[in-house]
């Protein structure tokens, strides 16, 4: 019996001496004591040398000692496995109190914001949006708008030509012509879209956006036009601006004017052009200028956006710099 107690203590001591709570080393001890050639297995095999009368009692004592050692080993195994699992979980633990990754949301481009702002204002006054092709014919871009053959806008250095009859439109005015050809007065339309001119510097790009307005009715007049633009500019810039109309010249309107607003620096800033639709333009689409009159407005979207948000370089709108674009979210 003393021999069995010493064997149990020896097994426990071997288990306790394992470094770093190694489960591999623990399994080696299990094999050493309880395997096919282990100490306790050998003791059970030696029972055949014991008399039949003593064998049951001796077998019970060996099993009792074996069970004590095995329970100690299994307890250590459970303890160390739990410790290993806890260490792994601690290493992989996520601190939910830390802020998570910010979900970035997209935003409208400032040019789109301006288009939406302008079209919303005029749609509430009964103007509808009309669209037209960006590859336009010489007729709709120039001839129908009373722009003669010798006009400088037709020059190669100002216009992108595909051939003598097709070009990238330089204005959305062609939409006005197409609309007047298919609709009868009264007409109230907006024509937003991309236009193209051969120019590139701090205030010009080869492609930019324009919105044009057209109103044709029997009593359309310049007084209505001035009142409409006064209201629009004050609503767009959200302040009671000083607005002035300067006489100007456009082939498709007569009389014509350019519209300025007073900037915060005390200087006048040009914002758009306008005028009464030229009688020749009305005749070109089959509308009698003696019965109907109309006015037209043309505004550069980027120009309005630059003034509203104090942007100094128009090219910034097309560089996709998130540091710039995030300011408008």
From Swiss-Prot:
Mg(2+) binds at residue 254. It comes from the Bacteria. Transmembrane segments: none annotated. It catalyses: tRNA(Phe) + L-phenylalanine + ATP = L-phenylalanyl-tRNA(Phe) + AMP + diphosphate + H(+). Disulfide bonds: none annotated. Binds 2 magnesium ions per tetramer. This is Phenylalanine--tRNA ligase alpha subunit. The gene is pheS.
